[in-house]
Amino acid sequence: DCPSDWSPYEGHCYK
């Protein structure tokens, strides 16, 4: 999973 302030999208994390 991603850090709580990041969001998952198409298999990676973004801010």
Curated annotation (Swiss-Prot):
Function: Interferes with one step of hemostasis (modulation of platelet aggregation, or coagulation cascade, for example).
Source organism (scientific name): Bothrops fonsecai (Fonseca's lancehead)
Protein name stated in the entry: Snaclec Bfon18
Keyword Disulfide bond: yes
Disulfide bonds: 2-13
A molecular-function term among this protein's GO annotations: toxin activity
Family statement drawn from the similarity comment of this UniProt entry: Belongs to the snaclec family.
Entry's Gene Ontology cellular component terms: extracellular region
Residue ranges constituting the C-type lectin domain according to the UniProt record: 1-15
Tissues in which the UniProt entry reports expression: Expressed by the venom gland.
Keywords from the named record: Disulfide bond, Hemostasis impairing toxin, Secreted, Toxin
Intracellular or extracellular location(s): Secreted
